[in-house]
Regions:
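Nucleotide-binding/hydrolysis machinery
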Residues: 2-17, 23-28, 32-39, 49, ...
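Short gly/ser/thr-rich secondary-structure transition/capping motifs
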Residues: 95-101, 135-141, 164
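Hydrophobic helix-rich structural segments at or within alpha/beta enzyme and signaling domains
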Residues: 114, 120, 133, 153-154
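ATP-binding "lid"/motif region of the histidine kinase catalytic
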Residues: 21, 75, 138
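Short, intrinsically disordered, charge-balanced linker/junction segments flanking boundaries
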Residues: 271-277
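Conserved Walker B catalytic segment
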Residues: 128-136
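Conserved post-Walker A coupling segment in P-loop NTPases
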Residues: 33-97, 108-122, 187-192, 241
């Protein structure tokens, strides 16, 4: 069985039309707000647990905004160095044959589109402050060089880090200088009615990618287990569980024993191993 073509990005699989028809009242309310906020020019802060779909929501905001024809520039903030963010956000003098230009890499790439600061809360506070200052200063300086560059910011914060920065000077700076709209994403365990919908979507996506999985489905027992699990890794973890089940079931029916052992109440010997005496 060929499975190499099953290694796809989680963002290719979630929060498209399937999520716009979410059964969860929480998500329906969020999508209603997002569709209205998309048309505004406000900066946005998305707060949610890891794997809850913040990046895809940012893309949906972009796709439904007046900036949809502009770029969507994502900047992943985890494990970056000081040089990484300075190269992206600080102004650099570029020496041409006939002139000297001030260039801001990510600001000019985003132009009048959107910059998505992915997991911004994982940065040291000094880096956060520098990036915000560079964004505001860069837009002003580029305007002086007759370059009208004003990308909109969407910032994602992990739930735990969000609570840590509340009340800090960097949080006050974000509120004062960006005047953002705050959107809180619910974890998957608070919207369990969407789990069967997402599983069905993931299975259909897997079927599209390989004929080896054209008969793929999930058993009622496996679906029950998925629907009653807390999913600490949220949508990303659910996707990975279904992907594992698809491979271990050889593209047939995903049973409980094909799901990750970490989410099962079964003991090891119940998976076919003999109980030790």
């Amino acid at each position: 069985m060929i499975i190499s073509n099953l290694h796809f990005d989680i963002n290719d699989m979630i929060l498209d039309d399937i999520e716009k028809h979410s059964k969860s009242a929480l998500m329906q309310d969020i999508f209603f707000k997002i569709l209205r906020l998309s048309k505004l020019e406000s900066h946005i802060i998305l707060v949610g647990e890891i794997g809850s779909g913040k990046k895809r929501l940012a893309q949906i905001i972009h796709e439904n905004s007046n900036r949809a024809d502009g770029p969507f520039q994502s900047f992943y903030c985890v494990d970056i160095t000081e040089n990484d963010y300075k190269d992206a956000f600080w102004g650099q003098l570029k020496f041409g044959k006939t002139n000297i230009e001030l260039r801001y890499d990510i600001l000019e790439k985003a132009f009048n589109g959107i910059i998505y600061l992915d997991q911004f809360s994982e940065l040291p506070y000094s880096y956060m402050r520098d990036i915000l200052d560079s964004y505001l200063k860069g837009c002003t300086q580029l305007f002086r060089y007759n370059k009208t560059v004003q990308p909109r910011l969407i910032i994602s914060l992990n739930q735990e880090s969000y609570h840590k920065i509340l009340g800090t000077s960097i949080w006050k700076k974000m509120l004062d200088e960006l005047d953002p709209v705050l959107i809180m994403l619910p974890p998957l365990r608070e919207r369990k009615e969407d789990i069967p919908v997402l599983i069905d979507h993931f299975i259909n996506e897997i079927k599209k990618r390989s004929q080896d999985f054209k008969d793929l489905k999930i058993s009622s027992k496996a679906l029950f287990e998925c629907s009653n699990y807390n999913w600490p890794g949220n949508i990303r973890q659910l996707k990975n569980a279904i992907l594992q089940g698809a491979v271990l079931s050889y593209g047939q029916t995903i049973e409980r024993e094909h799901l990750p052992f970490s989410m099962s109440w079964k003991l090891p010997y119940e998976f076919g191993e003999k109980k030790s005496s």
